[in-house]
Amino acid sequence: MQCKKVTTTREQMLDPAAAEWSSVPGESLKMDATPLANQPSEYIKASRDAKQIGKVKNLMVQAAHNGTDVFFRLTWEDDSQNTEITDTNIFPDGCGILIPLKGGDPPIDEMGSKDFPVNAWFWRADLKDGPRNTVAKGLGSTVFSKTCPIQAKGVWGQGAWAVVFARSLSVAEQKDEAVQLAPGGAVKIGFAVWEGSNGERAGVKSFSKEWRELTLEA
């Protein structure tokens, strides 16, 4: 997966509908359901049907950077816009990005491990104060950062979501909880989508089953 070098500003790229995104190549990813066996909640394991998890089957990803900031645009089909909890089984739509915090080959389906933690960027349609930056060292171990270095904006229309994440390539002051990126470098990367109308939340979601390698154009 290529992260294209662009000359546009963060303000421009944060708009999911910006014309600047039309020149950034995209890659379509097949999404799989998270395994029920990996859910930390016994209630979830007992109450969910594995065949009903992972409603979103395909995700389009575009990546770009301007030498200072990195941007990801995630788009997927969704015939319903869910922006709040409206029933016991209806939750807000969301999406996320997963990157190994310290390199290595963490188990993507288990949210990393003690020796190989992962950094997750999380957007959800109901979060009024912005996205979340988290670190995980295995299932059920997610810790939210007090300070989030990420910006995100999502729009829904014509039966689809488009969400853009933006962050400085380097966040040296948060090196223990935010992956450091640089032009010419490469990292493993994964993605997740939560379909709220399908009762998806927490560990119940669609995800990219294998790591992809993201190469940042020099």
Show which residues each predicted segment covers.
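Extracellular/luminal beta-rich ligand-recognition
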Residues: Q2-S41, E84-G157, N198, A202-A218
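Generic short beta-strand segments
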Residues: L36-I44, T75-D79, S168-S170
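Short linear interaction motifs
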Residues: K45-K57, S145-C148
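Residue-level recognition of well-ordered beta-strand positions that form the cores
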Residues: A64, R73-T75, L98, V155, ...
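A short, structured loop/turn motif at beta-sheet edges
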Residues: H65-T68, K102-G103, W156-W161, L181-G185
